[in-house]
Amino acid sequence: MNNQDQALIFEMSREGRIGYSLPELDVPETELESLLPGDYIRDEDAKLPEVSELDIMRHYTALSKRNHGVDSGFYPLGSCTMKYNPKLNEKIARIAGFSAIHPLQDEDTVQGALELLYDLSGHLEEITGMDEVTLQPAAGAHGEWTGLMMIRAYHEARGDFGRTKVIVPDSAHGTNPASATVAGFETITVKSNEHGLVDIEDLKRAVNEETAALMLTNPNTLGLFEENITEMAEIVHQAGGKLYYDGANLNAVLSKARPGDMGFDVVHLNLHKTFTGPHGGGGPGSGPVGVKKEFIPYLPKPVLTKKEGRLTFDYDRPQSIGRVKPYYGNFGINVRAYTYIRSMGPDGLKAVTENAVLNANYMMRRLAPYYDLPYDRHCKHEFVLSGRRQKKLGVRTLDIAKRLLDFGYHPPTVYFPLNVEESIMIEPTETESKETLDAFIDAMIQIAREAEESPEIVQEAPHTTVVKRMDETKAARKPVLKYERTLDGSR
């Protein structure tokens, strides 16, 4: 069977075939009915595949070869910071003192692990310019919600119950308005100006006594630095609102600028992005939230504190918004982030930003003659092109993304941000070499030429992948979410 026809694991099943043998029972046997109510006990055996260990290994090894990750190729997914994750991180995370402990252990038995969390919080405070950090949130959007809940608690503690609106720019990540809604706020959108930055006059019109916060990414999702950030902070603060920093793009300013110095009050970070936790497969992530002093009472509890040289969790936090996650955050990702920060140091983190920005600008300038550049100015860590020129030739941005698969690349982010027509969002990160960037650029140039000379090549792509184009509408409206085999053996 070739890679094109890889069977489902269920189709490989043969009755009586065994992949693993359990040891003999060495404890008293107990009837399942004595442990579980009848409603929870199966009436028939689960339809699990019966396959050998060798079959399993070959099956999943074959499937893994269809996957694409940072370790296998360039991954320029804009706004996702798909940088290489140093394998040193994995070695440290596997140390028994970190990997073989349990969150319910007595605090005295895990002081080393707690010291790592305490030190990591301190490093993140220094990097962001915040006064205290919680490591509880599990990922970026979770961090957003946590930060907004603290902002809500802050306003309500002051009796300011009328602050029910959160302002977001039209270039914002989709999680920003979603998090605001889940936190109980109404979202107000402000537009971008002709330079791709927040329109200051529109912001002034939007801010009023109902404003709870302005959520902002800096640099923004166009890869452009909001150069008027201090003026924006003053506008919002004078109206009694607060500034929330979406840390998705922190890779662009490490050791160069700090959100706290820009005027932000609450910050969330994506340790799985900026600080090299492996991501892209659905988790786990880590989305710590940093706050200025006035928000410390509202931090999720428990809060890790040091008393007389001993680390302990403080649960006596009457104004806390409460727990936002079981236990104390995704510890394994925090270990990896700590390892990265300590191994890089301040100068190394500064070099990260410098090289990320250099790579992005190099790519942008080389591609500008072949694709529209909606905002022709220096970018930070990422940039946005437009496929408007190709669209006039009958080639959509989606077609360009599909064609890149034939060259062995994961496509960039497409159709985001929403305020750029046929947008193509590229983030090379600092870890890619010039040779890799040039090879990707050459592929993009070839696709642009194909759109002019042989558009059907791009329109019908991909040509080399196991799965070609799917019916995306049907996949969205009538997804097949479970395996069922009919009596004749067909799917």
From Swiss-Prot:
Coiled coil: none annotated. GO terms for cellular component: cytosol; glycine cleavage complex. Keywords: Oxidoreductase, Pyridoxal phosphate. SUPFAM superfamilies: PLP-dependent transferases. InterPro entries: GcvPB (IPR023012), GDC-P_C (IPR049316), GDC-P_N (IPR049315), GDC_P (IPR020581), PyrdxlP-dep_Trfase (IPR015424), PyrdxlP-dep_Trfase_major (IPR015421), PyrdxlP-dep_Trfase_small (IPR015422). GO terms for molecular function: glycine binding; glycine dehydrogenase (decarboxylating) activity; pyridoxal phosphate binding. It holds the Pfam family GDC-P. Its cofactor is pyridoxal 5'-phosphate. GO terms for biological process: glycine decarboxylation via glycine cleavage system. It comes from the Bacteria. The modification N6-(pyridoxal phosphate)lysine is found at residue 273. It is an enzyme of class 1 (oxidoreductase). PANTHER family: GLYCINE DEHYDROGENASE (DECARBOXYLATING), MITOCHONDRIAL (PTHR11773:SF1), GLYCINE DEHYDROGENASE, DECARBOXYLATING (PTHR11773). HAMAP family: GcvPB (MF_00713). Belongs to the GcvP family. C-terminal subunit subfamily. The glycine cleavage system is composed of four proteins: P, T, L and H. In this organism, the P 'protein' is a heterodimer of two subunits. This is Probable glycine dehydrogenase (decarboxylating) subunit 2. It comes from Bacillus velezensis (strain DSM 23117 / BGSC 10A6 / LMG 26770 / FZB42) (Bacillus amyloliquefaciens subsp. plantarum).
